[in-house]
């Protein structure tokens, strides 16, 4: 080994050790000047001797340009959300459910960092992939940006065949204040809060910008530990620290839920004492075996819950109450407020839901009110301050005619909502289009409300189906578009034709049919044509489809306007069937593990093939594993497969199974 390569290796070890001491142990051993000097020397040597540059070098944290878009990546296991607890009663109920399934319980309580979930994958000890949460199953790969975060090790301190780690990316308060100050001086729009700033920073196409944002990362979960079974969540946190990750030190262990409740009360008062935003606490069953026994619901683990801090309340004035007409015709009263700063952003409006809510709270135009963000997200009026009334306040009355189209407004028996009776109401059509193009529906990027307003005003569209007839020459003159934007929009519209049945059903805006129901109906019927024929009785027999939804779906497809709309979509070439793989499902029902270094394909590609042919690409070996595909340097998974008598295939043997 040459002197240069030895020096480069020594610098890397010094820098990574300094990162571990600073971010992993919170015990810095170098001054900023000493650290910078080492890093600059490493960068210089690698530039002079590029033959020694490696992807896991600390110098690679400075960033560079990325491709024009982030590729999608399927998570090893779904990133489920947590159920929420808002008070002691919710926590007691959680404890009751847990103890009904397991006896002695110990809880770990961790800070709920207000950032964004990031999943990391290490192979042969090196970071190979990092991704956002996305929809929980598929996220965006942002590896290059994540490599700029010093708290994320590029190489593990202990060798591991494969390690999947989850944690929270965040922006410290100090970094956020500096960033907004720089943006203000540059005349750029400010970020509303550190969470939004962190999300925007991680989606930069130039990772050098991400590197400048000084983001942090706290790891809290391991999916595939290589050194035997980790028996508890506290053991997981210790293991993560040993591997070089930054782990939030502010976690506590309790044996009684009453202790947890008391601690939650203490933390409400201390929530602002940290250099980063927290919006609650996460309570987990400590014992991993008990976690497995408790299992999961369709959307969340039964062994964990998020305690959400009470919302911050701020006083302001109701300057006006304005009606907004939604896509189903509901008239929603919105309070226009004197702008105030609450829970990280400036609020100027708050929903009042319906007339019953206004009457119950006695909200009047001109009232002083307390507002908060429900779940620290959605602004709402909590109560009025009657002692501040002057007598000049005005009582709000719901209009008898729709403010958008002047059609009669009705309130059906048993409902709190007032509705516009016209299905051709411009507001309903506008909101229906906005919903149709939204991310979880047809996902037409670049088609925001402002562009939709222009298209409607210019007479280029009347409904969402007309989007598929738009032409380039008609789009270019529009104010918010141009040649490049028009090209991108037309491509996004064309791509949306292949979204499939479930997003299309959701995008239709059928009353009571959300995203989950769209998937259920798509799976049940397979084609739009079959769904159109469905009767109320058979719809009600489908799990999770109640009488109200069944009635709504049947009525929707009985309308002549619905048939006309769907025919326009068909003529445009929109796919109206569930997206089934054309490949034979040779691995259907099989759990398959891929391990080691492969020669012909990379591991992610093999896992994708397994899923395309009907199998499940699992991250760990168990008795349920059908077989293991093993490459070179296969570690503990190969040993466990042999121990359990699980068949082991080489890469070539796996290739021979494929059609």
From Swiss-Prot:
List, for all copies, the residue spans of the domain called BRCT.
Answer: 582-659
- Listed GO MF terms: DNA binding; DNA ligase (NAD+) activity; metal ion binding
- Recorded protein name is DNA ligase
Q: Which reaction does it catalyse?
A: NAD(+) + (deoxyribonucleotide)n-3'-hydroxyl + 5'-phospho-(deoxyribonucleotide)m = (deoxyribonucleotide)n+m + AMP + beta-nicotinamide D-nucleotide
Sum up the protein's function in the record's words: DNA ligase that catalyzes the formation of phosphodiester linkages between 5'-phosphoryl and 3'-hydroxyl groups in double-stranded DNA using NAD as a coenzyme and as the energy source for the reaction. It is essential for DNA replication and repair of damaged DNA.
- Cofactor(s), names only, from the UniProt record: Mg(2+); Mn(2+)
Q: Which domain of life is it from?
A: Bacteria
Q: Which residues form the active site?
A: 112
Enzyme superclass (EC) = ligase
- Identify the EC number(s): 6.5.1.2
Q: Which PROSITE patterns match?
A: BRCT (PS50172), DNA_LIGASE_N2 (PS01056)
Annotated family? Belongs to the NAD-dependent DNA ligase family. LigA subfamily.
What are the binding positions for Zn(2+) in this chain? 402, 405, 420, 425
Query: What are its GO cellular component terms?
Result: cytosol
A GO biological process this protein is involved in?
DNA repair
- What keywords is this UniProt entry annotated with? DNA damage, DNA repair, DNA replication, Ligase, Magnesium, Manganese, Metal-binding, NAD, Zinc
Q: Which PANTHER family match?
A: CHROMOSOME TRANSMISSION FIDELITY FACTOR 18 (PTHR23389), DNA LIGASE (PTHR23389:SF9)
Q: Where does NAD(+) bind?
A: 32-36, 81-82, 110, 133, 168, 284, 308
What species is given as this protein's source?
Desulfitobacterium hafniense (strain DSM 10664 / DCB-2)
């Amino acid at each position: 080994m040459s002197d240069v390569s030895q020096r480069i290796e020594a610098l890397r070890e010094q820098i990574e050790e300094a990162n571990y001491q600073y971010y992993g142990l919170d015990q810095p051993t170098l001054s900023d000047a000493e650290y910078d000097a080492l890093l600059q020397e490493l960068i210089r040597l690698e530039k002079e001797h590029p033959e020694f540059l490696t992807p896991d070098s600390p110098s690679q944290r400075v960033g560079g340009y990325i491709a024009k878009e982030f590729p999608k990546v399927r998570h090893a296991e779904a990133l489920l959300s947590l159920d929420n607890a808002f008070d002691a009663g919710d926590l007691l109920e959680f404890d009751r459910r847990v103890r009904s399934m397991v006896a002695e319980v110990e809880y770990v309580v961790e800070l709920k960092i207000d950032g964004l979930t990031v999943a990391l994958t290490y192979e042969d000890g090196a970071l190979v992939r990092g991704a956002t949460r996305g929809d929980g199953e598929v996220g965006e790969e942002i590896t290059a940006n994540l490599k700029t975060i010093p708290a994320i090790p590029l190489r593990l301190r202990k060798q591991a065949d494969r390690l999947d780690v989850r944690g929270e990316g965040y922006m410290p308060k100090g970094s956020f204040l500096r960033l907004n100050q720089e943006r203000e001086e540059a005349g750029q729009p400010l970020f509303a809060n550190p969470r939004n700033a962190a999300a925007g920073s991680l989606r930069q196409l130039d990772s050098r910008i991400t590197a400048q944002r000084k983001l942090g990362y706290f790891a809290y979960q391991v999916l595939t530990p290589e050194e035997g079974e980790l028996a508890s969540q506290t053991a997981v946190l210790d293991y993560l620290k040993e591997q070089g990750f930054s782990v939030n030190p502010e976690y506590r262990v309790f044996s009684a839920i009453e202790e947890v409740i008391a601690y939650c009360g203490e933390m409400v008062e201390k929530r602002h004492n940290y250099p980063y935003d927290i919006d609650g606490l996460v309570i987990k069953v400590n014992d991993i075996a008990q976690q497995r026994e408790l299992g999961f619901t369709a959307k969340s683990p039964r062994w964990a819950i998020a305690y959400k801090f009470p919302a911050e309340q701020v006083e302001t004035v109701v300057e006006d109450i304005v009606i907004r007409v939604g896509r189903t015709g509901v008239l929603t009263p919105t309070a226009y407020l004197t702008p105030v700063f609450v829970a990280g952003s400036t609020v100027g409006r708050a929903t009042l839901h319906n007339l019953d809510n206004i009457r119950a709270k006695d909200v009047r135009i001109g009232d002083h009110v307390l507002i908060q963000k429900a779940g620290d997200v959605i602004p709402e009026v909590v109560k009025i301050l009657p002692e501040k009334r002057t007598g000049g306040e005005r009582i709000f009355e719901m209009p008898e005619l729709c403010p958008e189209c002047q059609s009669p407004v009705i309130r059906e028996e048993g409902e709190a909502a007032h509705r516009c009776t016209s299905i051709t109401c411009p507001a309903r059509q506008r909101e229906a289009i906005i919903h149709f193009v939204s991310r979880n529906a047809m996902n037409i990027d670049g088609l925001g409300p402002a562009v939709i307003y222009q298209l409607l005003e210019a007479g280029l569209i009347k409904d969402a189906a007309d989007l598929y007839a738009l032409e380039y020459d008609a789009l270019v003159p529009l104010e918010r578009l141009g040649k490049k934007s028009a090209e991108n929009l037309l491509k996004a519209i064309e791509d949306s034709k292949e979204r499939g049945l479930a997003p299309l059903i959701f995008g239709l805006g059928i009353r009571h049919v959300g995203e989950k129901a769209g998937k259920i109906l798509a799976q049940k019927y397979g084609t739009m044509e079959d769904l159109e024929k469905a009767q109320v009785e058979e719809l009600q027999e489908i799990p999770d489809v109640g009488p109200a939804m069944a009635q709504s779906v049947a009525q929707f497809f009985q309308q002549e306007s619905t048939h006309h709309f769907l025919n326009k979509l068909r003529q445009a070439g929109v796919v109206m069937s569930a997206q089934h793989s054309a490949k034979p499902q040779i691995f259907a029902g099989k759990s398959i593990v891929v391990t080691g270094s492969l020669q012909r394909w990379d591991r992610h590609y093999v896992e994708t093939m397994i899923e395309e042919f009907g199998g499940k690409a699992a991250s760990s070996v168990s008795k349920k594993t059908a077989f293991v595909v093993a490459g070179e340097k296969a570690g503990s998974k190969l040993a466990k497969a042999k121990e359990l008598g699980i068949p082991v295939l080489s890469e070539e043997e796996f290739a021979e199974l494929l059609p």
